[in-house]
Amino acid sequence: MSTKGKHPRADQGTDPFEEKLQRLKEAFNTGKTKTAKFRAEQLQSLGRFLQDNSKQLHDALDGDLGKSGFESDMSEIILCENEVDLALKNLQTWMKDEPVSTNLLTKLSTAFIRKEPFGLVLIIAPWNYPVNLMIIPLVGAIAAGNCVVLKPSEISKNTEKVLAELLPQYLDQSCFAVMLGGPEETGQLLEHKFDYIFFTGSPRVGKIVMTAAAKHLTPITLELGGKNPCYVDDNCDPQTVANRVAWFRYFNAGQTCVAPDYILCSQEMQEQLVPALQNAITRFYGDNPQTSPNLGRIINQKHFKRLQGLLGCGRVAIGGQSDEGERYIAPTVLVDVQETEPVMQEEIFGPILPLVTVRSLDEAIEFMNQREKPLALYAYSNNAEVIKQVLARTSSGGFCGNDGFMYMTLSSLPFGGVGSSGMGRYHGKFSFDTFSNQRACLLSCPGMEKLNGLRYPPYSPRRQQLLRWAIGSESCTLL
């Protein structure tokens, strides 16, 4: 693995990546990564990396995002360890050929799906969950038998340093590499032909990555974002809703792609929800949230300035304070927000929660459906029928009724977007499937040629009728 913490630059040569990428491709062509033994060894080493370097990872996440140990464990380290354990436990089963049914014409043949690796995979991770969103895709890529290039975000520089310097010590350096750099280097890296690209980030950059992939017809997964709606029905307990919404809105200082971006509720519910949210924020972070060890910080000055600008939208009902020196934005609730204001036109990605009033469930659903399909959608109600209505009449990458992003802790559920919020799914076996080519295989008998006479010329109406029956579903039913 490379590159020992150095950022390759274009002026150091015509192409700083070409030689290393060629070596990785050659390593894949040896078949080294395809064996179950190799895959298991690499997964075990990845697990050791997480265990051995827990303190370094926690310190890096704290340095980058002011992330508490609790949040780092819950949203980064533990989930990665769970994915490694799950892959190791199920690797042999996932790798097995999958038998499929045949028709009468192929009854003496063997049909199956073989899961084979794509080859050289590029994983580009963002800064907001820099361990989780790098390691979990890596688990799937290793389990599927690929060679991998990892591109961590240069914005979360402390975590980038840990990944670049320590992870190479645990994985086979002939098959895996960490490559560093900013937008210029990433753009140059994307000029190369990969066999699969996995990108997590903004829709704007996702379009750039997809355009680069299209030049080589490279398959791609895009894990993007968007404005995730949260509908709160009148028939619910405001304090329960406030507790759950405040926790996952302000988790990681709101820098979470599946966090609720705005609440839709009636005017009556808003009047109850605002004091309930204030109560939850005070209980979670104290009278002065700036001094709380449980509230993170904005990643950098650029994002801080952007969020500070959004505080001028609508009317501040809770919070609104900021400190540029600490990159601190207080947990904030906005009311009287207009649809045309910037806070409702872009993904917030910070600890700001606008409340938008609607007159009915139908109006709320219409509001959601007039916008791009989100990565996540939430609904709160004591009436199960209301939850069912929201689920049935909307579309999103993920949905949760009466809770936040707890579904993200389940490897049994696929994670991903739809439309502008992304394409493709991963987590658990879905990660293995994403990084595997589902190869359709049919092994026929080399003899018994007379049985094939039906399909050879000269054709006749009788043969056509028999062929239709032999290929059709009725023949399988009769047998």
Curated annotation (Swiss-Prot):
The keyword Nucleotide-binding does not apply. Residues 477-479 form a propeptide. Gene3D superfamilies: Aldehyde Dehydrogenase, Chain A, domain 1, Aldehyde Dehydrogenase, Chain A, domain 2. Pfam families: Aldedh. Its main location: membrane. One of its GO terms (cellular component) is plasma membrane. It comes from Mus musculus (Mouse). GO terms for molecular function: aldehyde dehydrogenase (NAD+) activity. This is Aldehyde dehydrogenase family 3 member B3. InterPro entries: Ald_DH/histidinol_DH (IPR016161), Ald_DH_C (IPR016163), Ald_DH_CS_CYS (IPR016160), Ald_DH_CS_GLU (IPR029510), Ald_DH_N (IPR016162), Aldehyde_DH_dom (IPR015590), Aldehyde_DH_NAD(P) (IPR012394). Keywords: Cell membrane, Lipoprotein, Membrane, NAD, Oxidoreductase, Prenylation. It catalyses: an aldehyde + NAD(+) + H2O = a carboxylate + NADH + 2 H(+); hexadecanoate + NADH + 2 H(+) = hexadecanal + NAD(+) + H2O; octanal + NAD(+) + H2O = octanoate + NADH + 2 H(+). Expressed in testis, kidney, small intestine, spleen, white adipose tissue, liver and lung. It is found in: Cell membrane. Belongs to the aldehyde dehydrogenase family.
